[in-house]
């Protein structure tokens, strides 16, 4: 099995990245323009740090004739607070921080580069993940959260810098070698 086959097994229905590159072309902005974003999680109120970050992002985009957008990082749906997106939009407006594009209410976004809720961009990310696997630059991980926690605990106990060091990449390569040897012995 090669990387392309592996990618097709994992993401059989993912579109080719050329589809998204055509759908989301490079923005027609002046040279030096900056595109900035504020990506809060809808888990409660906007705090002063979030306001500061969005103010700086808004100013940088404005000063360079760029774009400031609001994309909501709603992937932690267990902690999501009802009507938090409306609260975020309202808080930004209270401080005269208005995005050029992105979420403008709980369910509505404005702009040509949406969707502006992270959870609704899954197909885009799958297409690029498939592309990276095809290139051999990414691999599937089969570890559970408990496995990752166990690895981290062992590393900390051994006073090793915690990190995930390609455990499943080695598994994929080993699995592929095993398949290749089986094919040769037939």
Where are these regions (language model features)?
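Active-site cores that bind ATP or allylic diphosphates and position pyrophosphate for catalysis
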Residues: 139-186
């Amino acid at each position: 099995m090669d990387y392309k086959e592996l990618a097709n097994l994992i993401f059989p229905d993912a579109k080719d990245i050329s589809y998204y590159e055509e759908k989301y072309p490079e923005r027609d902005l002046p040279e030096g323009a900056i595109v900035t974003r504020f990506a809060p999680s809808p888990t409660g109120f906007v705090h002063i740090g979030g306001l500061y970050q969005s103010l700086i992002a808004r100013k940088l985009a404005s000063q360079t004739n760029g774009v400031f957008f609001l994309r909501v990082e709603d992937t932690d749906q267990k902690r999501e607070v009802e009507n938090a997106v409306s609260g975020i939009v309202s808080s930004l407006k209270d401080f005269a921080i208005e995005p050029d594009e992105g979420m403008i209410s709980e369910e509505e976004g404005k702009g040509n580069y949406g969707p502006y809720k992270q959870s609704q961009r899954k197909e885009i990310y799958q297409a690029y993940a498939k592309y990276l696997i095809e290139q051999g630059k990414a691999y599937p991980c089969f570890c559970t959260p408990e496995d990752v926690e166990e690895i981290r605990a062992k590393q900390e106990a051994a006073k090793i810098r915690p990190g995930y060091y390609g455990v499943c990449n080695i598994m994929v390569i080993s699995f592929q070698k095993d398949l290749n040897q089986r094919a040769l012995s037939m």
